[in-house]
A protein has these predicted regions:
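Short beta->alpha connector loops at strand-helix junctions that form conserved
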Residues: 13-14, 30-42, 135, 176
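An N-terminal-biased, well-structured beta-alpha scaffold segment characteristic
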Residues: 1-34, 159
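Phosphate-coordination loops involved in phosphoryl transfer and adenosine-cofactor binding
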Residues: 7, 85-88, 160, 169
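N-terminal Rossmann-fold NAD(P) dinucleotide-binding loop
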Residues: 98-99
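NAD(P)-binding Rossmann-fold cofactor-contacting core
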Residues: 107-125
Length: 194
């Protein structure tokens, strides 16, 4: 950046700049840092709904079973699947992506929780989200969407303490920066739950 003396702006395709540029340097030197991420919010939101339905209904496993000639039928094919209807759905981070995702989920449920300490409570309440602590979200939720950007304060904030609070059949979908989650803890807990 120091060598780019005529640089006026940087366009980033991510909503988060921490991992790939010195935002503070840009700010101090009058370099605009702009994000194109909001353009992709609807696309990612629709993918998120697809992932959620696949996890809840075990579509991915049914596909694998079908390919391997181990297709199951009737009760056996639905033993571990569940409905999205009337689930408690939570958003960790309530930015552009959450604002696109929530309306897609409203036909299934109206029980939404949110955690976003960087936003005013009124914004979450105006979007019909009950404000909760991370502990409460991990205890109560059937589906948790991790949508927050990474900061120095939230790196690995989702750790074994929180993950161990999750209900047995709840779903965790990480659609933001992976560093918000401690993956070593996630892998250990995932192996225990199988």
């Amino acid at each position: 950046l120091k060598k780019a003396t005529k640089l006026k702006a940087i366009f980033n395709v991510e909503s988060n700049f921490m991992d790939n540029m010195d935002y503070e340097y840009c700010f101090r030197n009058g370099i605009y840092v702009l994000s194109t991420a909001p353009v992709f919010a609807q696309t990612v939101a629709e993918i998120a709904v697809g992932f959620t339905l696949s996890l809840k209904r075990e579509i991915h496993q049914s596909h694998i079973d079908f390919i391997n000639n181990k297709e199951k039928y009737g009760l056996e094919s639905n033993m571990n699947s569940s409905l999205l209807q009337n689930n408690t759905v939570s958003f960790i981070g309530f930015g552009d992506l959450a604002k696109k995702l929530k309306p897609l989920l409203e036909p299934f449920t109206n029980n939404f929780l949110a955690y976003d300490p960087w936003l005013p409570s009124k914004l979450l309440e105006d979007n019909n989200c009950k404000i909760n602590s991370l502990n409460e979200i991990f205890k109560k939720s059937d589906v948790i969407y991790v949508l927050s950007s990474i900061t120095t304060k939230n790196k690995h904030m989702i750790d074994k303490k929180l993950l161990n609070l999750m209900k047995q059949n709840s779903c965790l979908l990480i659609l933001s920066r992976a560093n918000v989650v401690n993956f070593k803890d996630l892998l250990k807990i995932s192996k225990k739950r199988k």
